A protein has these predicted regions:
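Active-site rim/loop-helix segments in enzyme catalytic domains that contact anionic ligands
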Residues: 1-109, 230
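Metal-dependent de-N-acetylase/amidase catalytic core
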Residues: 1-13, 93-241
Length: 241
């Protein structure tokens, strides 16, 4: 299929503040290039993203604010609107209160296309973020779910993003992001608090992970760099391109 994002309102719904750069920043940049409006929503605050050896007491105060600032700075480079779910790391789940928050975000932003985590990604917050995005994409159109904003006229299309490290994900299609790798790197560079964790034994160096994934998906697609997706084929969340 030939993608043209002109006129679209694309919203990436991710679990953590640095997930966009790893999985879909190049596609959002492609959208902006085509004339789309793009947005980024992180459901979790990133409050537990601290270096090994540091106690919660040492860094818990202010971590959320730091990561919110990093997320906002990265979005500014892209020209994206930002939204925050405000949930603590590890506490994300598909429950009514969290659904209502994302439904409200959908109704304020009014996306035509949502990029969401794959339902089998490695992190529990990623899987919960998918469940919330999938549910909100439907209930945001229902007048029975009252949030104070007007319901959407129709559900947005829903694309599933690649999994981190490409585990157990069969791409349905690829987006060529070769020209946007420098922007992905610049955006990732905004997340200084996480880049400082590169030496942690339990934390993958983010830039290496991001570049390796873009390169491998690019090789599969016959281009320098790519991001992989799959269309979520459920009723009214599918449309022709």
């Amino acid at each position: 299929m030939k993608l043209d994002f002109a006129g679209e309102r694309v919203l990436a719904v991710v679990a953590h503040p640095d997930d966009v750069e790893l999985l879909c920043a190049g596609t959002l940049a492609r959208g902006r290039e085509d004339g789309a409006t793009v947005g980024m929503c992180t459901m979790c605050r990133g409050n537990r993203g601290m270096a090994a050896g540091e106690s919660a007491n040492e860094r818990s105060f202010g971590v959320s604010e730091v990561r919110q600032g990093e997320f906002t700075a990265a979005a500014k480079l892209l020209g994206a609107e930002v939204f925050f779910g405000g949930i603590g790391d590890g506490e994300l789940e598909d429950i009514p209160k969290q659904r209502r928050e994302l439904i409200s975000i959908f109704r304020r932003y009014r996306p035509t296309l949502v990029l969401a985590h794959a339902p089998n990604d490695y992190h529990a917050d990623h899987r919960a973020a998918f469940e919330l995005a999938e549910a909100a994409s439907w209930f945001a159109c229902s007048a029975g779910h009252v949030t104070g904003e007007e319901p959407l006229e129709r559900p947005p299309a829903l694309w599933l993003m690649d999994t981190v490290e490409m585990h157990d994900f069969s791409p349905g299609f690829y987006v060529d992001v070769s020209e946007h790798v420098p922007l992905k790197r610049d955006m990732l560079g905004c997340h200084k608090s996480q880049l400082e964790r590169a030496g942690d034994s339990d934390f993958a160096p983010l830039e290496q992970l991001m570049l390796r994934q873009a390169q491998v998906r690019g090789e599969q697609a016959g281009t320098e760099a790519a991001e992989a997706f799959r269309i979520h084929t459920v009723w009214k969340r599918v449309r022709a391109w």
